[in-house]
Regions:
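Aromatic/hydrophobic pocket-lining residues that form π-stacking "cages" and hydrophobic walls in ligand
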Residues: 1, 27, 223-227
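Catalytic-core regions built around general acid/base machinery
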Residues: 1-7
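Predominantly a Rossmann-like dinucleotide-binding segment in NAD(P)-dependent oxidoreductases
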Residues: 8-13, 18-99, 107, 234
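A structural signal for well-ordered alpha-helical scaffolds and beta->alpha junctions
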Residues: 20, 24, 72-79, 144, ...
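A short acidic, glycine-rich active-site loop
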Residues: 63-69, 160-166, 186-187
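Contiguous beta-strand/loop segments that form the cofactor/metal-binding neighborhood of enzyme cores
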Residues: 77-161, 187, 194-209, 225, ...
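C-terminal helical cap and adjacent loop that interface with cofactors, partners, or active-site loops
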Residues: 165-244
């Protein structure tokens, strides 16, 4: 597709819509502001309680099936947006539900020097778990709940509704100031999937950059495959640049 787009002189853009999740935008802003200092640990969770295996292709065990290929692209892309290419990764993929044919659990660790990025997903988590947990040299941020845009669409809402993308659950920011722990709630940024389409429109018109160029999607695909290889080999694997 990349070669065809170049040959036909067309724009090729990938729908990594979760770059515009409200909770992710909030985390991105806090990191850009240096609110947590030097990040030491970043956790991104997609935990669910779906104990029954359903009859659908995502759970049938064929090519492209499984929780890692379903949710991994989203949280890998978000991690790459924040921190760039990792030095190494180690993955553990599992089939935990009775009768599961495709992986329904993943725990993937990305190494960036001494910093660790943890990507975790499961279908057997009944407790309310945080979506993001970030620890740094000057504080921590914890955010519960999922971005609301998908549910709003299912309810028939459309932008520009007044509450579009507005997350009702604030995050918890804990900072060390003058040696004292200070805690406060942080209202989330409004999610905005429409920003992707506006970006594509601007790129087609020559008025802006491609919001998600193909090479960024290829980097995600390479890490998805590398994680499967890591799981199969049971060891940490180095991450090479896509050009390598």
């Amino acid at each position: 597709l990349v070669e065809l787009a170049e040959k036909q002189q067309r724009l090729l853009s990938i729908f990594h819509n979760r770059r515009w999740d409200g909770d992710f935008l909030t985390v991105r802003r806090l990191l850009a502001e240096g609110a947590l200092g030097q990040v030491a640990q970043f956790e991104s969770h997609f935990d669910r309680y779906r104990p029954e295996v359903r009859q659908r292709w995502r759970e049938a065990g064929g090519p492209g099936s499984g929780l890692w290929f379903d949710l991994g692209p989203h949280i890998l892309d978000q991690s790459l947006q924040l921190f760039g290419q990792p030095d190494w990764l180690q993955a553990d993929l599992g089939k935990q539900r009775p009768g599961a044919l495709a992986d329904d659990y993943f725990h993937v660790v990305l190494g960036y020097g001494e910093m660790r990025v943890i990507l975790h997903g499961s279908c057997l988590v009944s407790a309310v778990m945080p979506r993001f947990v970030v620890h740094g040299s000057q504080g921590s941020f914890i955010k519960f709940g999922m971005d609301v845009q998908e549910e709003q669409l299912k309810e028939g809402k459309r932008p520009p509704a007044a509450d579009w993308g507005v997350d009702p659950a604030p995050g918890q920011l804990s900072q060390i100031r003058d040696g004292q722990l200070v805690q406060q709630t942080v209202a989330g940024e409004a999610g905005d999937y429409g920003a992707y389409y506006r970006g594509v429109c601007a790129a087609i018109r020559g008025e802006g950059e491609n919001p998600v160029p193909a090479d960024e999607a290829l980097a995600v695909m390479a890490l998805l495959d590398l994680a499967r290889e890591s799981d199969q080999q049971g060891r940490r694997l180095p991450c090479q640049k896509l050009s390598d």
